């Protein structure tokens, strides 16, 4: 039985198969190795991938894109709200969760983000099965380093609903290093590796220390304001200006025309990673006018010059954060489709002139390739010594809410970046004259204030003997294992009564 790895990104999805000692990305039914993470609802059918992306121009309100942004989030989550604002498909609140409102004329229904992700996972499963000629169920799935518990849970549910048996979830930077075998070839050596990922809607930079075959994250940062879509939008705006210059028509306010230009700009952007120029042709762009425009790589680089600067600054900030000079970095691994852009690669090379830059595996394929290798390891198809190669640290802050009148005081039990396994304990004080105590646990990325949406678990101690005076000490112990599972124990120190919960995590 083959092992596969699946990467579901914000704009694209990709599946790799581990077979005969190596991992390879497999092409979908359109012959493409990367599939747009787009789902379209038509009157008689649901379409996924390139067909859905191409039909979005005429079916925008029933086409869902960037579902990963909203997956596992509450309706009121700031990131979900940003997604809702930008979505052409109407999103409504149902039971505190966001739902897509689909109306094809034939049917009206609400669709959850998990339902959409399930359809994309099903497409990946079909792609792998078509390539292998047999059924496939076992999978390793990749997740961003900053994915919270609720997001990972939603992703796992979507994959399971698609018929997958999840062997493990693996962090994207970890998968990238596995793809290149970093730490395998010299398991006793020590090195620092920068993982640079420029995806469709975000940029992440991660510094990893590799020592004795173990990966340890020194620092990581994610920037949601910059991604491959930004380059596409910049090029589309340029094309709109060219159309106006030639035909004296400003189409920037025409959503349909701009969507056509976005599709053409996206194709041109990809072509310019390998060609010196690309032709942008749009049939009947506006008012029956066929638009034809050639864009050179030099022009594209000029149009996107400010974006390139935004893509490089995070590297400098990360180096400053960990106290490194460029010469302290031994390797740079490129991930994400937009990391293919030659100008970006050159700018990174200029920062690290003496450092090995790894891009022999296509950047948009390196993460699923690493996931497939991990799947092969777990199924015993590869040297199991490699199973020690894993990122061992917490991805976000774990906090407990203090029991006080304000209701807004939190204590960090486990900071993000803590090496795993880890055990932390904290004593909370509750009024002695109560018979039950509810302890609430929250998760935070450290960038925004802690809100109710951040709560991921609670432990209740019941039937406690009331005290006539004083306070009650509650010992809270949080243990996070290497696999990401959480074990939380709360004990009343007076009576010894305790409760424990376990939150499993396949990452």
Swiss-Prot record:
<dbReference type="Pfam" id="PF00012">
    <property type="entry name" value="HSP70"/>
</dbReference>
<dbReference type="GO" id="GO:0140662">
    <property type="term" value="F:ATP-dependent protein folding chaperone"/>
</dbReference>
<comment type="function">
    <text>Component of the ribosome-associated complex (RAC), a complex involved in folding or maintaining nascent polypeptides in a folding-competent state.</text>
</comment>
<dbReference type="InterPro" id="IPR042049">
    <property type="entry name" value="HSPA14_NBD"/>
</dbReference>
<dbReference type="GO" id="GO:0031072">
    <property type="term" value="F:heat shock protein binding"/>
</dbReference>
<dbReference type="GO" id="GO:0005524">
    <property type="term" value="F:ATP binding"/>
</dbReference>
<dbReference type="GO" id="GO:0044183">
    <property type="term" value="F:protein folding chaperone"/>
</dbReference>
<dbReference type="GO" id="GO:0042026">
    <property type="term" value="P:protein refolding"/>
</dbReference>
<keyword id="KW-0067">ATP-binding</keyword>
<dbReference type="GO" id="GO:0005737">
    <property type="term" value="C:cytoplasm"/>
</dbReference>
<dbReference type="GO" id="GO:0051085">
    <property type="term" value="P:chaperone cofactor-dependent protein refolding"/>
</dbReference>
<keyword id="KW-0143">Chaperone</keyword>
<dbReference type="GO" id="GO:0016887">
    <property type="term" value="F:ATP hydrolysis activity"/>
</dbReference>
<comment type="similarity">
    <text>Belongs to the heat shock protein 70 family.</text>
</comment>
<keyword id="KW-0963">Cytoplasm</keyword>
<dbReference type="InterPro" id="IPR043129">
    <property type="entry name" value="ATPase_NBD"/>
</dbReference>
<dbReference type="InterPro" id="IPR013126">
    <property type="entry name" value="Hsp_70_fam"/>
</dbReference>
<comment type="subunit">
    <text>Component of ribosome-associated complex (RAC).</text>
</comment>
<dbReference type="InterPro" id="IPR029047">
    <property type="entry name" value="HSP70_peptide-bd_sf"/>
</dbReference>
<protein>
    <recommendedName>
        <fullName>Heat shock 70 kDa protein 14-B</fullName>
    </recommendedName>
</protein>
<dbReference type="GO" id="GO:0005886">
    <property type="term" value="C:plasma membrane"/>
</dbReference>
<keyword id="KW-0547">Nucleotide-binding</keyword>
<dbReference type="GO" id="GO:0005829">
    <property type="term" value="C:cytosol"/>
</dbReference>
<dbReference type="GO" id="GO:0005634">
    <property type="term" value="C:nucleus"/>
</dbReference>
């Amino acid at each position: 039985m083959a092992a596969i790895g699946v990467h579901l990104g914000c704009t694209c999805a990709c599946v790799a198969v581990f077979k005969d000692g190596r991992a390879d990305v497999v092409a979908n039914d359109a012959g493409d190795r990367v599939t747009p993470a787009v789902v379209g609802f038509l009157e008689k059918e649901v379409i996924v991938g390139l067909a859905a992306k191409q039909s979005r121009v005429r079916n925008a309100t029933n086409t869902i894109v960037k579902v990963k942004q909203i997956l596992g989030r509450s309706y009121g989550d700031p990131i979900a709200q940003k997604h809702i604002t930008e979505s052409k498909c109407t999103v409504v609140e149902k039971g505190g969760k966001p739902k897509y409102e689909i109306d094809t004329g034939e049917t009206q229904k609400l669709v959850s983000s998990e339902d959409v992700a399930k359809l994309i996972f099903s497409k990946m499963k079909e792609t792998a099965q078509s390539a292998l000629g047999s059924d496939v169920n076992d999978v390793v799935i990749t997740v961003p380093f900053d994915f919270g518990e609720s997001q990972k849970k939603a992703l796992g549910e979507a994959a399971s609903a698609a018929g997958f048996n999840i062997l493990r979830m693996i962090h994207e930077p970890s998968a990238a290093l596995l793809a290149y075998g970093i730490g395998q070839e010299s398991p006793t050596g020590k090195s620092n590796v920068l993982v640079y990922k420029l995806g469709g809607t975000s940029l992440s930079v991660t510094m990893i220390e590799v020592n004795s075959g173990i990966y340890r994250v020194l620092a990581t940062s994610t920037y949601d304001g910059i991604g491959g879509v930004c380059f596409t939008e910049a090029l589309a705006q340029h094309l709109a200006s060219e159309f106006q210059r030639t035909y004296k028509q400003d189409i920037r306010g025409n959503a349909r025309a701009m969507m056509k230009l976005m599709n053409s700009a996206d194709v041109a952007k990809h072509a310019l990673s390998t060609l010196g120029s690309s032709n942008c042709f749009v049939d009947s762009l506006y008012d029956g006018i066929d638009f034809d425009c050639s864009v050179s790589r030099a022009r594209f680089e000029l149009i996107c010059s400010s974006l390139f600067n935004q893509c490089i600054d995070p590297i400098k900030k990360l180096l400053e954060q960990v106290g490194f000079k460029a010469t302290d970095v031994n390797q740079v691994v490129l991930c994400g489709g937009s990391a293919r852009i030659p100008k970006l690669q050159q700018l990174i090379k200029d920062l690290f002139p003496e450092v090995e830059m790894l891009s022999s595996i296509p950047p948009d394929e390196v993460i699923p390739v690493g996931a497939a290798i991990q799947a092969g390891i777990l199924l015993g198809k590869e040297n199991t010594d490699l199973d020690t190669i894993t990122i061992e640290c917490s991805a976000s802050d774990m906090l407990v809410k203090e029991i006080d009148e304000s209701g807004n005081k939190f204590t960090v039990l486990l900071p993000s970046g803590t090496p795993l396994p880890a055990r932390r304990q904290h004593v909370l004080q509750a009024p002695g004259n109560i018979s039950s105590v509810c302890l609430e646990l929250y998760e935070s990325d450290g960038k925004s204030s802690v809100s109710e949406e951040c709560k991921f678990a609670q432990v209740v101690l019941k039937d406690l003997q009331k005290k006539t005076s004083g306070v009650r000490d509650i010992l809270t112990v949080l243990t996070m294992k290497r696999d990401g599972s959480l074990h939380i124990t709360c004990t009343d120190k007076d009576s010894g009564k305790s409760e424990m919960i376990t939150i499993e995590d396949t990452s």
